[in-house]
Structures are given as structure tokens and as C-alpha cells.
Design a protein with these regions (language model features):
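Active-site scaffold of zinc-dependent metalloenzymes
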Residues: 41-67
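Post-HEXXH active-site segment of zinc metalloproteases
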Residues: 85-107, 111, 115
Length: 225
């Protein structure tokens, strides 16, 4: 069962990637920068599309909602996803969760970590942590009142608005990311951050292998009876 679930997740992600690539290739050259593709859609949407070349796919609605500084922050965030190959980490986390639902918190932790990684990169590029925080918050709020995102963006996108609660301990990823950007920056090293994400992904791979072996053992036990 675990193996079947993993296959389904892989096929779904592959279809989303193929759809997104076709869409981006058709619109290539209609962007605001060399690696940016603008989709004529009023949805609030932006995501990094990995590959050779990698693209930043952004909706016209998103661009209209941000000023020039906000767009700079957005593009810096998405370029961090492309440069860091963050899709590899998130894919491993999601496959691990598909094989074993108990690992869903692990997948969410990986998603949040790569978003924070990209946030900090955008803050360094712009030199303005408050700008990045405001851009994230604005995009999340507007996304709640615009049309739903296409399938590819829903799977690959990074804009995941959550309802803000009173306590940040129970808040969704967006409020926590904004709070982290508004707080004084902690001394961090990119190598250590990359190592933390890699270790988390490695844990996911290990869990995936464990799930596979458990499935094999259950099949053997069933055959024995």
C-alpha cells in the first residue's frame, strides 16, 4: 500500500511538472526578466519551476499587487529556491509522508525550512527584512480573495496562505515566517542551514526505506499464513 501511494504521488507531481513546463515554455519571452515568465492570470501566484533552464512563474495578478521593491523581494525568494534545488528536499519529504503518514510533520518541517531559507536570502538581497515580511504577508492575504490556483501551482507553488491565529506557537507557516523576519536576525551560516535541510531530507529517505522494508515484511507474513 505504501509503495502504491508513493507511485501515485510521483505520477501526480510528474504531471504537474509537465503541465507547468508546457505553460512556461509557451509564455517564455513574455516575462519582466530573463528567467521570469508571466502568466496572464489574476490569481495571486508565484512559484519556482526547476529544470534547465529553471523559471520563475508569476501571475499578472501577483505583479499588479506588488510594487517594484516587492517584486524584487519576490524574485529573490524564488531564485533562492532554484539555486538551492529546494524541490529535491521537498519531494523527498512528501514521498516519505506518502509512504508513512506519521512522517507528515517531517514533510511540513522541510517545506517550512526551505521557505525560511529563501526568505533569508531575499532579505539579504534586498537588505530589508521588513520589506520581505510585508511582501509575504500581502501575497498571503490577497491569495485568500482571488481565484484558486491551477493544479501545477497547487503542487509546486510556495504561496500557502494560512489563517493567522492569536498564538504564533499554533500559527501557520506564513505568520511564523513573517514573525521570524520581523525579529532580529540570528547569526546563521548557509552551510549549517543547508546541512540541517539535508539531514532532514536524509531522515525522510531513511523513513521511506523503512516503510518499504516494513511493507515487504508484512507481505511475507501474509504469505506465511
Amino acid at each position: 500500500m505504501a509503495a502504491l501511494t508513493v507511485v501515485i504521488v510521483c505520477r501526480r507531481r510528474a504531471r504537474a511538472l509537465a503541465e507547468a513546463y508546457r505553460r512556461a515554455a509557451h509564455l517564455a519571452g513574455h516575462g519582466v526578466d530573463g528567467d521570469v515568465v508571466v502568466v496572464p492570470d489574476q490569481a495571486i501566484e508565484a512559484y519556482a519551476l526547476p529544470g534547465w533552464p529553471g523559471w520563475i512563474v508569476v501571475s499578472a495578478g501577483m505583479l499588479a499587487a506588488l510594487d517594484a521593491d516587492g517584486q524584487t523581494a519576490l524574485f529573490a525568494h524564488e531564485r533562492a529556491h532554484l539555486a538551492g534545488r529546494h524541490h529535491l528536499f521537498t519531494t523527498v519529504g512528501r514521498l516519505a509522508a506518502a509512504a508513512n503518514p506519521l512522517l507528515l510533520p517531517l514533510a511540513r518541517a522541510v517545506d517550512y525550512t526551505v521557505e525560511r531559507w529563501a526568505d533569508e536570502h531575499a532579505a539579504r538581497v534586498t537588505g530589508d527584512r521588513r520589506l520581505v515580511a510585508a511582501t509575504i504577508g500581502r501575497a498571503a492575504l490577497l491569495a485568500q480573495h482571488r481565484p484558486p490556483r491551477p493544479t501545477a501551482a497547487a503542487i509546486l507553488g510556495i504561496t500557502r496562505p494560512r489563517t493567522c491565529r492569536v498564538s504564533l506557537a499554533w500559527a501557520g507557516p506564513v505568520p511564523r515566517r513573517v514573525a521570524a523576519l520581523l525579529a532580529p536576525p540570528l547569526p546563521r551560516h548557509a552551510v549549517l542551514l543547508a546541512a540541517a535541510v539535508a539531514l532532514t531530507a536524509l531522515a525522510g529517505v531513511s523513513a521511506l526505506e523503512a516503510a518499504r522494508y516494513l511493507h515487504a515484511l508484512l507481505e511475507l507474513a501474509r504469505a506465511a499464513h
